[in-house]
């Protein structure tokens, strides 16, 4: 059943008023594949537009906070934290963005995590396109989520993190 449709098939915002307030967390990932020389410039901080990685982190955080303004039917959520990690993977010639979003609320933060990772990737593309127009944004997905009535989720493409 699609929760965003009423009994007549019309879109509506899901009523979460009766759901329990719980700790929620979601992680999302986006990869930006690029030429090896572009990755070297990014990691060294030598692109003409400045510190691309710091700008991408800030853009991702801002995007998570604006998710309800951009995705129809998303609830505005009081986010507790948004973290953006950007890892260089030279062997695959890509940057991997992992966003982690937390809140205490009645609905999950998967969309906020996806927005954060996606907009961070778009920012990297925007700031590096002058040197590499062939970059590809790929593998955008929810890695995991915790909290809520439907329980935890771990995407099969990501290893289980047991460090916490």
Curated annotation (Swiss-Prot):
Sample GO molecular function, one term: cyclic pyranopterin monophosphate synthase activity
Pathway connected to this protein: Cofactor biosynthesis; molybdopterin biosynthesis
Enzyme Commission number, as recorded: 4.6.1.17
Catalytic activity: (8S)-3',8-cyclo-7,8-dihydroguanosine 5'-triphosphate = cyclic pyranopterin phosphate + diphosphate
List of residues binding substrate: 73-75, 111-112
Keywords associated with the record: Lyase, Molybdenum cofactor biosynthesis
Entry protein name: Cyclic pyranopterin monophosphate synthase
Gene encoding the protein: moaC
């Amino acid at each position: 059943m699609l929760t965003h449709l009423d009994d007549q098939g019309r879109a509506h915002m899901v009523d979460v008023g009766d759901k329990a307030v719980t700790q929620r967390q979601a992680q999302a990932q986006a990869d930006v594949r690029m030429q090896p020389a572009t990755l070297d410039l990014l990691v060294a901080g030598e692109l003409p537009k400045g510190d691309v990685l710091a700008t991408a982190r800030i853009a991702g955080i801002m995007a998570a906070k604006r998710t309800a303004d951009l995705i129809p039917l998303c609830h505005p959520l009081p986010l507790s934290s948004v973290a953006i990690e950007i890892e260089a993977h030279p062997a695959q010639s890509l940057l991997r963005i992992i966003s982690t979003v937390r809140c205490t609320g009645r609905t999950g933060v998967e969309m906020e995590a996806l927005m954060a990772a996606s907009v961070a990737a778009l920012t990297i593309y925007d700031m590096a396109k002058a040197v590499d127009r062939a970059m590809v944004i790929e593998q955008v997905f929810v890695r995991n989520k915790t909290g809520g009535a439907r329980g935890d989720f771990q995407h099969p493409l990501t290893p289980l993190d047991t460090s916490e």
